[in-house]
Amino acid sequence: MDRHDHEPNAHVPIEDRDELTYYEKRTWAIQSLLVEKGILTADEIRRQIEMVDSQTPADGAKVVARAWVDPAFKARLLRDAKAAVAELGLDSGESPVLVAIENTAKVHNVVVCTLCSCYPRALLGLPPDWYKSLNYRSRAVVDPRGVLREFGLELEPDVEVRVYDSSADMRYLVIPERPPGTERMSEAELAGLVTRDSMIGVTKVRSPEPQPDLKASAPA
């Protein structure tokens, strides 16, 4: 027989709420109606939720890495992001318009959704809690440098900061600057450097850690 014992005071127990929130009740009501009217099945809803929960920033990182190594692709990406993403066999999501915006040495772009949490989930996965917070949504527009500073990013005074407000009809993907020291890296290795936050614009992509010279350290 399996046992599941707890030592006294081992950890704080999880306390479930007895009542659903307003939005949870509304979600369940809509889901029940969709199933009842035969528009969707419970399994189709479950599979869609599972698919959304499984999305990660990996696809977005692939797009960025390709743009870094292929100038022609980057030009197409900046011109028509949805079409360029489709070239890689990737899904850019349900939003009618996806816009790629490039960070440079003189221009730094930041994305926010001032109304809710609109976000290119198909490429970046679920939005982080801070992206959905009122603090970020309200301050990113009026004090972007201050917000970036809180993420540890201090920009030079001569760098222009542009803030893009995402919406249900238009999502944005930041193409961060390629960091120095990556000239000999493969496309797959470059993708491994790209983070979710850099594709939102609140951080830069860091240069890879220097690798030790094994030949130099080997005994003669």
Task: Please state what every model-predicted region is.
Residues 2-220:
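Terminal, compositionally biased segments used for targeting/anchoring and flexible tails
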